[in-house]
């Protein structure tokens, strides 16, 4: 099957208005219920996800209701040559986490991890 495109991309949308009760500021609790965004960053809870993604300029969704399998918080433009392959939702193999995270950022959150290891060859 072809990878999802645009609005059909992985993850679920969040109704962030329920957390934005004061009009401009979010009133988030310190309650720990980690969620993983389609930007492959772990947020401490859904409200913090809303607060920190509101100004990203593109729709970050929640990929899963726990910590990310692959964390892209600290990624670099300069990647090493290490080989720890990851399979992206676009069906492409990425040689390592750094290259995968750069592709995630370039896709504006549309790309997500399909599985650890190489994608199956057709």
UniProtKB/Swiss-Prot annotation:
<dbReference type="Pfam" id="PF00050">
    <property type="entry name" value="Kazal_1"/>
</dbReference>
<keyword id="KW-0677">Repeat</keyword>
<dbReference type="GO" id="GO:0004867">
    <property type="term" value="F:serine-type endopeptidase inhibitor activity"/>
</dbReference>
<protein>
    <recommendedName>
        <fullName>Double-headed protease inhibitor, submandibular gland</fullName>
    </recommendedName>
</protein>
<dbReference type="InterPro" id="IPR036058">
    <property type="entry name" value="Kazal_dom_sf"/>
</dbReference>
<feature type="disulfide bond">
    <location>
        <begin position="72"/>
        <end position="101"/>
    </location>
</feature>
<feature type="disulfide bond">
    <location>
        <begin position="79"/>
        <end position="98"/>
    </location>
</feature>
<dbReference type="InterPro" id="IPR051597">
    <property type="entry name" value="Bifunctional_prot_inhibitor"/>
</dbReference>
<dbReference type="GO" id="GO:0005576">
    <property type="term" value="C:extracellular region"/>
</dbReference>
<dbReference type="InterPro" id="IPR001239">
    <property type="entry name" value="Prot_inh_Kazal-m"/>
</dbReference>
<keyword id="KW-0646">Protease inhibitor</keyword>
<feature type="site" description="Reactive bond 1 for trypsin">
    <location>
        <begin position="30"/>
        <end position="31"/>
    </location>
</feature>
<feature type="disulfide bond">
    <location>
        <begin position="16"/>
        <end position="50"/>
    </location>
</feature>
<feature type="domain" description="Kazal-like 1">
    <location>
        <begin position="10"/>
        <end position="70"/>
    </location>
</feature>
<feature type="domain" description="Kazal-like 2">
    <location>
        <begin position="71"/>
        <end position="121"/>
    </location>
</feature>
<feature type="site" description="Reactive bond 2 for elastase">
    <location>
        <begin position="81"/>
        <end position="82"/>
    </location>
</feature>
<feature type="disulfide bond">
    <location>
        <begin position="28"/>
        <end position="47"/>
    </location>
</feature>
<comment type="function">
    <text>This inhibitor is composed of two homologous actively inhibiting halves: one which inhibits trypsin, the other which inhibits elastase.</text>
</comment>
<keyword id="KW-0964">Secreted</keyword>
<dbReference type="InterPro" id="IPR002350">
    <property type="entry name" value="Kazal_dom"/>
</dbReference>
<feature type="disulfide bond">
    <location>
        <begin position="36"/>
        <end position="68"/>
    </location>
</feature>
<keyword id="KW-0722">Serine protease inhibitor</keyword>
<feature type="disulfide bond">
    <location>
        <begin position="87"/>
        <end position="119"/>
    </location>
</feature>
<keyword id="KW-1015">Disulfide bond</keyword>
């Amino acid at each position: 099957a072809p990878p999802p495109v645009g609005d059909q991309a992985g993850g679920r949308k969040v109704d962030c208005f329920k957390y934005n009760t004061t009009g401009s500021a979010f009133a988030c609790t310190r309650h720990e219920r980690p969620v993983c965004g389609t930007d492959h960053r772990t947020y401490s809870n859904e409200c913090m996800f809303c607060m920190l993604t509101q100004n990203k300029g593109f729709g970050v969704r929640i990929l899963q209701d726990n910590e990310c399998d692959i964390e892209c918080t600290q990624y670099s433009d300069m990647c090493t040559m290490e080989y720890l392959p990851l399979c992206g939702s676009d069906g492409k193999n990425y040689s390592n986490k750094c290259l995968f995270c750069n592709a995630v950022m370039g896709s504006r959150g549309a790309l997500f991890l399909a599985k650890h290891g190489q994608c199956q060859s057709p």
